[in-house]
């Protein structure tokens, strides 16, 4: 799988009264194959802007976005996007939503059903495959959103606060599911969140962005997700003194930028 990179990227918007607003400044970040990278930072620091650059929804004002060394000039099937708002089609079933992308891509019926059936099992929705979207809970809808992104077999998943709207119990279960999906599919992941605890739990690498203009100020490497895969409970991991110590370090880095 290919590395997704931002190199010396600036994003400048036109603000009120003709004034320019710099959302990101001199940002360089490479997501290597198999990594789970999580971005944190204060509101307005440019996390979502960076994700939009990677997705091809937004061009940089300067610098370059590349995938496997080739310029990213727009959205593409090699990058799957999952939003906080699941953006599902309410008139379709779970299966219909998940099969939508492969159907649009022209995948033949037998292969489409086999691929999507496997993904439906992977996200734990086999019993609900023929349910309509409006019949599902928030957590189940997000499972459908993740499955729909995976159905196109992207090289990397780009996730914009996918668990932000969920209650605490559902969110923790979904964090565990995300780790299992990452492990089993071997996809790279770039996720943004406001939760430092969530970042530490999920990531192999955390990047901290400063307030606007957003710059990457710190990076932290972590591997608590491996303990989830080994069968340790979320509560045990999150109460570990090493986890708590890292949480304080990351939070201090976020707050240092916000207070500057």
Outline where the language-model segments fall:
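The feature captures the beta-strand-to-loop junction immediately N-terminal to the Walker
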Residues: 40-42
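A short, flexible loop at the N-terminus of ABC-type nucleotide-binding domains that lies
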Residues: 1-3, 12-26
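Hydrophobic anchor residue at the start of the ABC signature
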Residues: 146
């Amino acid at each position: 799988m290919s590395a997704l990179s931002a190199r010396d990227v600036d994003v400048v918007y036109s603000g009120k009264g003709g004034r320019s607003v710099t959302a990101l400044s001199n940002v360089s970040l490479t997501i290597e194959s198999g990594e789970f990278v999580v971005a944190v930072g204060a509101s307005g620091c440019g996390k979502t802007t960076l994700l939009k650059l990677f997705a091809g929804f937004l061009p940089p004002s300067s610098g370059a976005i590349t995938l496997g060394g080739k310029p990213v000039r727009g959205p593409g099937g090699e990058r799957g996007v999952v939003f906080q708002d699941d953006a599902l089609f309410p008139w379709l079933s779970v299966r219909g939503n998940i099969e939508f992308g492969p159907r649009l891509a022209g995948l033949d019926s037998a292969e489409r059903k086999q691929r999507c059936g496997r993904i439906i099992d992977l996200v734990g929705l086999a019993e609900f495959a023929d349910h309509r979207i409006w019949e599902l809970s928030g957590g189940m809808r997000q499972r459908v959103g993740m499955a729909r992104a995976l159905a196109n077999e992207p090289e990397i998943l780009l996730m914009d606060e996918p668990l932000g709207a969920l209650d605490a119990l559902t969110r923790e279960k979904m964090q565990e599911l995300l780790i299992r999906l990452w492990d089993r599919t071997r996809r790279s992941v770039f996720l943004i969140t406001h939760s430092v605890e969530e970042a530490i739990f999920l990531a192999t690498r955390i990047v901290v962005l400063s307030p606007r203009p957003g710059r990457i100020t710190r990076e932290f490497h972590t591997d608590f997700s491996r303990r989830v895969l080994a069968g340790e409970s979320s509560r045990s991991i999150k109460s570990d003194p090493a986890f708590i110590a890292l949480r304080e370090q990351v939070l201090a880095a976020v707050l240092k930028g916000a207070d500057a």
